[in-house]
Amino acid sequence: MTARKYYEKMKVACQNDIKQSRCRADIMMKSPRANVALRIAMAALTSLVTIQWHSASVSAGEYTGNDPVVVAQAERALSAFERWRLRGDTVAYLEYIEVRSETAAQVAIRTGMLPEEVQNAWAEGDLGGQRAALAALTQVGVPYKRYTEEEGVSFDCSGLTGYAWGRAGVDLPRSSRSQDRSANRVDPENARVGDLTWYPGHIMLYLGVDSLVVHSPVRGRTVEYGTLSEDRAGWVRFADPLTSE
């Protein structure tokens, strides 16, 4: 049985168990059966894509600015989340978990990370941070343009982070420095998916593992994701908008 067929089979079994659940993150799901079923299905999905890992990956300091698969998956995950949030559709929440995990695996493959590592990092983060990261990924390939924040058209660095957190229900100031100052500083070892990642003159969103980020860098490039170079990674600091001071 494929992972997807297994997932479909478990939907009905899990639905009643989690009907009253309002989860902050996957680890808080009330149903042990739903939890175990989803973990098994996601592990199977990971095994299906891991074989592509080495051939498709890029190196540290390189970025992916053209990935329609990730863009479509991220938008689908956010759509499922909204159905759950607005209507309490628990099947939609299960779909959100599945598609979010698929998106994490694709990002991992393209950046040379272990899919399971990125999937776990996203699952353990706040739902707000998950949504912000996914929102930013829906804009991969959109051109950089200074002083702009227009979905599907153009972004500068703080325009992208503001847009992403806006879709998660959090308003941020406009400039990169103001955004960094408005959020609560986080030690690197405690940084989670969606956290603001700042160095002087530039701001990004953390994708939960090592120095993996999504950002809108400079003129002539697009919204992209990848890992920072070792030199650059040593300069960044992290901040969490959900615990702003």
Task: Name each region found by the language model.
Residues 1-32:
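N-terminal secretory signal peptides that target proteins for export/translocation
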Residues 17-19, 34, 172, 176:
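Coiled-coil-like amphipathic alpha-helices with heptad-repeat character
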Residues 24-143, 230-245:
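Intrinsically disordered, low-complexity
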Residues 61, 170-229:
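...with weaker cross-activation on analogous glycine-rich loops/strands in unrelated enzymes
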Residues 140-193:
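Catalytic cysteine-centered active-site loop
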